[in-house]
Amino acid sequence: MPDEVITYAEMCKRENTRLRRGMNFNLGLTHSVILMSMRSDAPYRDRFEKDGTTLIYEGHDQSRTVINLEPKLLDQPAATSSGALAQNGLFYRAAERFKAGQRDAERVRVYEKIQPAVWSYNGLFHLVDAWQEEDAERKVFKFKLAAVAGGEDLIVTVRRPLIPSQVKLEVWQRDGGKCAVCGATERLRFDDGSPRTKRRSSPTAKNVRLLCAEHCSPDQ
């Protein structure tokens, strides 16, 4: 359910795998998973566009090794040393094939780190574009994902505005990690009082509360 608070263990259980990396292409042949963060200490520059429905996700670096001590100085890889596509390459190829009309958009579940041990499920996205751009003296991958309404529905393409990351963090801290109504600490969601499918703009902290499943608004 989009906007719900979730633990790392719960994420892994839901996806039926231990999520050891941020990019996970085609898990179980039904969807992909990415882990994002907009915290000040985040290793990558993920961002939401001003329209509130679009995520620009940065690709991931080469692994740190004895040879590659500073991955931030190297181009992000499209392939591994063996020649197989790396996660960047897999997502990039899927986006290119979608743009060429050769496949449907890749369905991607997005989980966002709000603070240590606290994650939020941002819902289902469609991967619609990918490119490389210069970042100082190296090239990085960028992936464009559109948030879609309708939960996990394969065919829904209506975009839905997201609750911004900074709003979630502010609300979490303001409400003390508990339901604002009853004080429950489990099955929590960020609730702006309106159905997700009818949300027209990104909410602010003034109209978002942390609520348990029992007290959430309809369709939350």
Model-predicted regions and their roles:
Residues 2-120:
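Acidic, glycine-rich low-complexity segments with interspersed aromatic residues
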Residues 34, 108, 125, 143, ...:
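A broad, low-specificity signal marking well-ordered, structured residues that form hydrophobic/aromatic
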Residues 103-105, 122, 138-140, 185, ...:
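Eukaryote-biased feature marking scaffold/signaling PDZ-domain proteins and nuclear chromatin regulators
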Residues 167, 181-183, 215:
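Extracytoplasmic low-complexity repetitive segments enriched in small/polar residues
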Residues 208-220:
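Short Cys/His-centered divalent metal-binding micro-motifs
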